[in-house]
Amino acid sequence: MPRPSPCADSGGGMMTTLTARPEAITFDPQQSALIVVDMQNAYATPGGYLDLAGFDVSTTRPVIANIQTAVTAARAAGMLIIWFQNGWDEQYVEAGGPGSPNFHKSNALKTMRKQPQLQGKLLAKGSWDYQLVDELVPQPGDIVLPKPRYSGFFNTPLDSILRSRGIRHLVFTGIATNVCVESTLRDGFFLEYFGVVLEDATHQAGPEFAQKAALFNIETFFGWVSDVETFCDALSPTSFARIA
């Protein structure tokens, strides 16, 4: 029998149970958020940062389509949609200088140091690289948040936005599973949020084993793993039950 999450009956709303690994999880869609992580040209489009840095982005198109499907279902169910855009100011002050680990580990910054002609083009606010892909367009009522590091909780109002709305369950999509998606979900776990990742609405940076490792970490230690079809089924009207 599916086990409800510990806060499943706290809101008295319409609840649904999502089949997931390692066990099902019950939540109120109207007290939950769908988080779309960094679906920018930088991460999902040929000619973007990841592509120029040597990562394979050739299989991101199905991920974009699956995110579209998940967003449509979530919006219809009354879930808050939050879009993240990763990047910095044009001078990269927000990226940090040599005294910041980000300066040394960000592949975007390292790529620009190797190819100075790309300076100001990768992950710079206002650039094509920074923009969300054409297929994914935020709608009125959605929230779009810039973030300067891998985790969407670092130096952003995400925690305040969620707490002020009574949101405890977060459903994750986006790129990269093993970097910004996992980092944000982990930080959410430490802040007492229930995190679910839709595996076919995410894509890794690196080899396929990076995707598998990230999903293993999430389902074993930090959250739950499901898929878009199952998520949409859980949000269909016949799946809801009222919990007083």
UniProtKB/Swiss-Prot annotation:
One of its GO terms (molecular function) is hydrolase activity, acting on carbon-nitrogen (but not peptide) bonds, in linear amides. It comes from the Bacteria. The active site is at 38 (proton acceptor), 147, 180 (nucleophile). It catalyses: (Z)-3-ureidoacrylate + H2O + H(+) = (Z)-3-aminoacrylate + NH4(+) + CO2; (Z)-3-ureidoacrylate + H2O = (Z)-3-aminoacrylate + carbamate + H(+); (Z)-2-methylureidoacrylate + H2O + H(+) = (Z)-2-methylaminoacrylate + NH4(+) + CO2. The keyword Endoplasmic reticulum does not apply. InterPro entries: Isochorismatase-like_dom (IPR000868), Isochorismatase-like_hydrls (IPR050272), Isochorismatase-like_sf (IPR036380), RutB (IPR019916). Signal peptide: none annotated. CDD domains: cysteine_hydrolases (cd00431). It holds the Pfam family Isochorismatase. GO terms for biological process: nitrogen utilization; uracil catabolic process. Induction: Up-regulated by the nitrogen regulatory protein C (NtrC also called GlnG) and repressed by RutR. Its EC number is 3.5.1.110. Keywords: Hydrolase. It is an enzyme of class 3 (hydrolase). The keyword Hydrolase applies. Hydrolyzes ureidoacrylate to form aminoacrylate and carbamate. The carbamate hydrolyzes spontaneously, thereby releasing one of the nitrogen atoms of the pyrimidine ring as ammonia and one of its carbon atoms as CO2. Belongs to the isochorismatase family. RutB subfamily. HAMAP family: RutB. NCBIfam families: RutB. This is Ureidoacrylate amidohydrolase RutB. It comes from Shigella sonnei (strain Ss046).
